[in-house]
Amino acid sequence: MKKTIFQQLFLSVCALTVALPCSAQSPETSGKEFTLEQLMPGGKEFYNFYPEYVVGLQWMGDNYVFIEGDDLVFNKANGKSAQTTRFSAADLNALMPEGCKFQTTDAFPSFRTLDAGRGQVVLFTQRGLVGFDMLARKVTYLFDTNEETASLDFSPVGDRVAYVRNHNLYIARGGKLGEGMSRAIAVTIDGAETLVYGQAVHQREFGIEKGTFWSPKGSCLAFYRMDQSMVKPTPIVDYHPLEAESKPLYYPMAGTPSHHVTVGIYHLATGKTVYLQTGEPKEKFLTNLSWSPDENILYVAEVNRAQNECKVNAYDAETGRFVRTLFVETDKHYVEPLHPLTFLPGSNNQFIWQSRRDGWNHLYLYDTTGRLIRQVTKGEWEVTNFAGFDPKGTRLYFESTEASPLERHFYCIDIKGGKTKDLTPESGMHRTQLSPDGSAIIDIFQSPTVPRKVTVTNIGKGSYTLLEAKNPDTGYAMPEIRTGTIMAADGQTPLYYKLTMPLHFDPAKKYPVIVYVYGGPHAQLVTKTWRSSVGGWDIYMAQKGYAVFTVDSRGSANRGAAFEQVIHRRLGQTEMADQMCGVDFLKSQSWVDADRIGVHGWSYGGFMTTNLMLTHGDVFKVGVAGGPVIDWNRYEIMYGERYFDAPQENPEGYDAANLLKRAGDLKGRLMLIHGAIDPVVVWQHSLLFLDACVKARTYPDYYVYPSHEHNVMGPDRVHLYETITRYFTDHL
């Protein structure tokens, strides 16, 4: 196949690629071998080999709570030891009204603490929701629920819940058993398939995870209203009924009309709803809604359709009128606000804003006139989670990649700026929860050699270890896991990789290698977590004599804007160049059988897998592409146009990434897998690729999961990976 100029350039760079010194986890070659039922989520024995964890661990004021056996455990965080109060399912049953007993008393129900009341929890039972006051030890209210109830959102004080049923939005107040939902207020009444209230919008991009937003005191509820009538529906077919049923999916594809979103505010005291006067154009993205502490203003980060401009606007909550634009952010590639405003404790006019304006995600202090007071954090690293403030509101707490892109540590910094202080210096991945008053943290820690360690730290006063998980792999054979860096195709950017070696590795032998690929934004596959972030299937294939290699190419997450945005308007090109540098590294290893290299990936990784098989069929013998994007014209607007621009603006980029036009280039064995009811990468993608292959006289293999969406989850995931395993063992 004729090489493009771009391919010739990156191949010459990759020829000079050498791996920098790597580290390795020593293998344990003696012991039993794993099964897929033990290694894959959904497997019958998966949780026997999953590092032990603390169930339901979360803060309740300055106390932390979790489930242990059939007890809810309530501990005071004092930095030294656990002061434990226990409350069992049997104790709870004794307090429940007649007719609301749990069907079993051998386990405490799942729960969540509420933002305000320090002793308030909501219990999720088989009959509905139970409000429970831990301190007073009494049931405070009940909500009946059913399978039609969705998108539950509790008010800050926990006495009301917003929910969606049949596309309409309701607010219910807890009452006696059987009265909860029947006493609900209908906030909207005209909901339909094409007019949806209270749900996440814009395909859940821009950090949008829900569609309702309570004001701080619970007196108002902001909500999304999404008109989809201008979007042409895509059919999703359920084949289980005797006569198959088609349901419309309102999926706005790149370059086509988008849905129109507005924001309403319901005032509980008056029963009145006002809509924000967001004006024209209607095709824009209303993201990251946040309330002022006094409930008078609702702030919205508004992104234009081109996604190169973000305006942070203020609206009057009483009238819906536009008040002011606080500031505007622009970027020649794209903007992507992911976080709402976070106000300083006790302040109604100063807040923290997260932005990548200097090339890295950092924290900025603003006032509500739009004046930038200062940039608080700085450096060539990313803030990955802003946790909150200390009790005085003078210090900020956050997680970041400052120590390494492979790690997350918990830091504090004075709000006036200065040096950061690492409060979790142990090398690895720290996932933290800051207590509501900012005085303590729960630190859930993993490293390549630490399965899980849970520590409760009273900041500045001491720590208490709640859990040190044992190695769940003891007694089983484990392959060697190597990690290190290679150079990207630009010759100057280091890329992190992980390499799972074949079990019982003999350097004198030759082994096949499978490249597991994703490569796109918002994903990082190589981290310093348990087993060096190696997945169960990698270990399973190592048992069968395969090596599995993964490299986070440019375009992937947590390495800054320039690292990610290099793919803009040309998806699949830079990522593929970097993946081929990884292949060159593999070929430089004496033990690699260069004639037996395979590739596997899902979603964006499915696109990459198919692309690699079509472009480098002389290198990759076998590929398995799951849920693949085949033609970006048929992907949704929010993600697709962010990274590609609209098809009308970038026809060359869309054309270069359109794999339908290259079906005739298939040389090796390629199996495509798709969920028949996939709402993310619609089934149309792989079906049309099959049709293109028929016309081109090429012969991929194909597997469909009729009952699954974008990912095959639950027990069927074991079946999925047995299918993938058989394909590689048969053909590679």
UniProtKB/Swiss-Prot annotation:
GO terms for molecular function: aminopeptidase activity; dipeptidyl-peptidase activity; serine-type peptidase activity. Its EC number is 3.4.14.12. Disulfide bonds: none annotated. One of its GO terms (biological process) is proteolysis. Residues 1-24 form the signal peptide. It catalyses: Hydrolysis of Xaa-Xaa-Pro-|-Yaa- releasing the N-terminal tripeptide of a peptide with Pro as the third residue (position P1) and where Yaa is not proline. It comes from Porphyromonas gingivalis (strain ATCC 33277 / DSM 20709 / CIP 103683 / JCM 12257 / NCTC 11834 / 2561). It is an enzyme of class 3 (hydrolase). It holds the Pfam family Peptidase_S9. The active site is at S603, D678, H710. InterPro entries: AB_hydrolase_fold (IPR029058), Peptidase_S9_cat (IPR001375), Peptidase_S9B_N (IPR002469), Serine_Prot_S9B/DPPIV (IPR050278). This is Prolyl tripeptidyl peptidase. The gene is ptpA. The keyword Cytoplasm does not apply. Serine proteinase. Releases tripeptides from the free amino terminus of proteins. Has a requirement for Pro in the P1 position, but is inactivated by Pro in the P1' position. Keywords: Aminopeptidase, Hydrolase, Protease, Serine protease, Signal. Belongs to the peptidase S9B family. It comes from the Bacteria.
